[in-house]
């Protein structure tokens, strides 16, 4: 029973990781927020029951959301966490009870309440009153530098007003697009025959992620502050609400609906009032945020892995509509998972037109009792992601058709299998399956794997469709001349891809393991395997018993690893990759005997490094004991400056921070 539950936990992790990427990176979610939240709460409940099963790559240990490659990355000095959700008065009461139980001597009665804006979380850094950096939340630890775009937002002060502001302060808040501005933007797009945005949130996110800030400047964006991060120079009020008022005096806008209330009943009344006036408000919201007002209590309550214990988002009820289920298509993912996708009569619900919804698996189809031709209830839980929640069976006409789950893969026609205890049906074709092949190759060249610049999804799909590659090793046999037969592929672009493939041959053992796409082996697990076994050969021949000795590897993951390397076709792929020249440096022994000359030092990398990639340099510095951050401050001990170093180098010089060169870094290594 315990093994079955742990296996289910691993499946939950996989699903949560997948849907987080669909939501935060691809902007193409498959399931409603409510379903994601349910899965997350189920995962956290199992982990609470079995804390020994918690792994570093668990979704409970991080904030959803991944920084894109288009912008320079920024490391948040204090993580920008997300919020836990409540969907009922009972869950709100449980949140408050947990807080009070943790601090029995405190009287928790004052709460700062505000609408939960449906936009994009950002961080604004002011130094000596001047805006010097703006960043997205990203994954909570690392975000995107969007300073030039944020400077175009009229409600964001470029310089703080008044007096008495800290020498350094980070203000966090939400960038959003008011309803009126959104409608006007879409009206202009329609008149020009251009594509319109589906909702204000997407419009705000798309506007902030423009590489050309002149485009952002034309978009009707607004900003409201909701909290403070780093503060240096002065002490702020011990009241969260009073901090809001102080920010307002310095020229930072706050949501006018924000209130300080006393007592649980007042919190509920605030929620009911905002819900009642929701449609009349000039901006989109999907709930209210409730924060314990006392900063001292906040600090003592602290955080869980992904959210503060002193705040919660009380979400509004999901919005629902009726529509017809016209058909069901079956999609195949990288690991062979076959997912039924409902094709719906388009319906406008929760601010977007919905035409697709996931049906998850065969069990879900059976549970719903849904048939093609049924009238179904579509819900957009959290106002973001659609799902089929029920069937209106009394509207059936008698010509509805059963949904037949395929017995063979819809792409490669290999037989499908469903392992006992799993809800997912999988194609057994592996890389023989064109769908799996495409997804496996996309994973292989992705940023966190081999990181092949320029080899995007559309290029991979063409290569597979034209039968130019079958396995990852085939990529390294491509010539520029061969690549030019692809659509929109000129000689220069083709040569750039060949060059990028050659550069990617020099990697690390951890990246190589991750690139292979072994089920459940994410970045952290791959790194643990590399550190533990040191060589690929040792991992390939490791027994199940040896594998479960590795930190964060349990029975299920160990089975996936041994099964992968036991497959002859996988052995051939790995060998072919080695023969193509993929190499990595020896994995260093980690332990007290390894000197850490930078132990406890705060280090910043800036400029262009010629001998190391930025990622490799960061990893090397961390092995030497350093904490690598993304911005220079008084707390910075060393700045390693490469070629064309800019503002960070200038700031380091102004602050008197020690500056070293790339050669100094190489000497340390």
Swiss-Prot record:
Binding positions (Zn(2+)): 409, 412, 427, 433
Residue ranges of domain BRCT in the record: 593-669
Pfam families xref list: BRCT, DNA_ligase_aden, DNA_ligase_OB, DNA_ligase_ZBD, HHH_2, HHH_5, Nlig-Ia
EC numbers for this chain: 6.5.1.2
Residues involved in NAD(+) binding: 33-37, 82-83, 114, 137, 174, 291, 315
CDD domains according to UniProt: BRCT_DNA_ligase_like, LIGANc
Names of the cofactor(s): Mg(2+); Mn(2+)
GO CC annotations on file: cytosol
Catalysed transformations (reactions): NAD(+) + (deoxyribonucleotide)n-3'-hydroxyl + 5'-phospho-(deoxyribonucleotide)m = (deoxyribonucleotide)n+m + AMP + beta-nicotinamide D-nucleotide
GO biological process, any: DNA replication
GO molecular function: DNA binding; DNA ligase (NAD+) activity; metal ion binding
Alphabetical keyword list: DNA damage, DNA repair, DNA replication, Ligase, Magnesium, Manganese, Metal-binding, NAD, Zinc
Active site: 116
InterPro entries recorded: BRCT_dom, BRCT_dom_sf, DisA/LigA_HHH, DNA_ligase, DNA_ligase_AS, DNA_ligase_CS, DNAligase_adenylation, DNAligase_N
PANTHER family per the UniProt record, alphabetical: CHROMOSOME TRANSMISSION FIDELITY FACTOR 18, DNA LIGASE
Reported function: DNA ligase that catalyzes the formation of phosphodiester linkages between 5'-phosphoryl and 3'-hydroxyl groups in double-stranded DNA using NAD as a coenzyme and as the energy source for the reaction. It is essential for DNA replication and repair of damaged DNA.
Family named by the database record: Belongs to the NAD-dependent DNA ligase family. LigA subfamily.
Protein name: DNA ligase
Origin species: Vibrio vulnificus (strain CMCP6)
Lineage: Bacteria, Pseudomonadati, Pseudomonadota, Gammaproteobacteria, Vibrionales
Gene: ligA
């Amino acid at each position: 029973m315990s093994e079955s539950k742990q296996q289910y936990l691993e499946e939950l992790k996989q699903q949560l990781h997948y849907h987080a990427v669909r939501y935060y990176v691809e902007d193409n979610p498959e399931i409603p927020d409510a379903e994601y939240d349910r899965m997350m709460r189920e995962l956290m409940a199992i982990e609470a029951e079995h804390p020994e099963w918690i792994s570093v790559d668990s979704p409970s240990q991080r904030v959803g959301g991944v920084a894109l490659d288009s912008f320079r990355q920024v490391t948040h000095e204090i993580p920008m966490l997300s919020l836990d959700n409540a969907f009922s008065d009972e869950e709100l009461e449980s949140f408050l009870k947990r807080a009070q139980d943790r601090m029995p001597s405190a009287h928790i009665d004052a709460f700062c309440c505000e609408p939960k804006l449906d936009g994009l979380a950002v961080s604004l850094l002011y130094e000596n009153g001047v805006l010097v950096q703006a960043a997205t939340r990203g994954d909570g630890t690392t975000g995107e530098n969007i300073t030039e775009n944020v400077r175009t937002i009229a409600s964001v002060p470029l310089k703080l007003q008044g007096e008495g502001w800290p020498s350094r302060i980070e203000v966090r808040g939400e960038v959003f697009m008011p309803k009126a501005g959104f409608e006007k933007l879409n009206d202009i797009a329609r008149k020009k025959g251009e594509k319109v945005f589906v909702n204000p949130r997407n419009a705000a996110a798309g506007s902030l992620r423009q590489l050309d800030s002149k485009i952002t400047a034309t978009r009707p964006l607004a900003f409201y502050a909701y909290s403070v991060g780093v503060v240096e120079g002065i002490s702020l009020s011990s009241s969260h609400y009073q901090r809001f008022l102080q920010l307002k005096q310095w020229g930072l806008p706050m949501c006018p609906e924000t209130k300080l209330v006393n007592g649980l009943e007042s919190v509920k009344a605030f929620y009911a009032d905002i819900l009642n006036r929701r449609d009349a408000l000039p901006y989109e919201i999907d709930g209210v945020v409730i924060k314990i007002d006392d900063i001292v209590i906040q600090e003592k309550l602290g955080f869980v892995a992904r959210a503060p214990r002193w705040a919660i988002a009380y979400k509004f009820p999901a919005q629902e509509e009726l529509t017809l289920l016209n058909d069901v298509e079956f999609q195949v993912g990288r690991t062979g998972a076959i997912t039924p996708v409902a094709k719906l009569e388009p319906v406008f619900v929760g601010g977007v037109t919905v035409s697709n919804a996931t049906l998850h698996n065969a069990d879900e189809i059976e549970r719903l009792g849904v048939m093609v031709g049924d009238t179904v209830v579509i819900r957009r839980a959290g106002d973001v992601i659609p799902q089929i929640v029920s069937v209106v069976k009394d509207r059936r006409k008698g010509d509805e058709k059963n949904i037949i789950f395929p017995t063979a893969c819809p792409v490669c026609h290999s037989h499908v299998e469903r392992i006992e205890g799993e809800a997912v049906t999988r194609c057994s074709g592996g890389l023989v399956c064109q769908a799996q092949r495409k997804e496996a190759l996309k994973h292989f060249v992705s940023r966190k794997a081999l990181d092949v610049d320029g080899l995007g999804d559309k290029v991979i799909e063409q290569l597979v469709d034209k039968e130019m590659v079958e396995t990852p090793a085939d990529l390294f046999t491509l010539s520029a001349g061969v690549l030019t037969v692809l659509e929109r592929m000129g000689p220069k672009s083709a040569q750039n891809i060949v060059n990028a493939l050659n550069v990617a041959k020099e990697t690390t053992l951890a990246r190589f393991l991750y690139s292979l796409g072994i089920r459940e082996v994410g970045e952290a697990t791959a790194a643990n395997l590399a550190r533990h076994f040191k060589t690929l050969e040792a991992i390939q021949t490791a027994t199940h018993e040896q594998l479960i000795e590795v930190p964060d590897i349990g029975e299920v993951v160990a089975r996936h690893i041994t099964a992968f390397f036991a497959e002859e076709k996988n052995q051939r792929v790995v060998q072919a990759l080695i023969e193509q020249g993929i190499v990595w440096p020896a994995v260093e022994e980690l332990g007290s005997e390894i000197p850490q000359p930078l132990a406890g030092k705060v280090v910043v990398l800036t400029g262009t490094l010629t001998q190391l990639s930025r990622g490799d340099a960061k990893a090397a510095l961390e092995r030497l004991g350093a904490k690598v951050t993304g911005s220079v401050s008084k707390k910075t001990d060393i700045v390693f400056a490469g070629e064309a170093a800019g503002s960070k180098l200038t700031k380091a010089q102004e602050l008197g921070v020690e500056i070293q060169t790339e050669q100094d870094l190489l000497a340390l290594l």
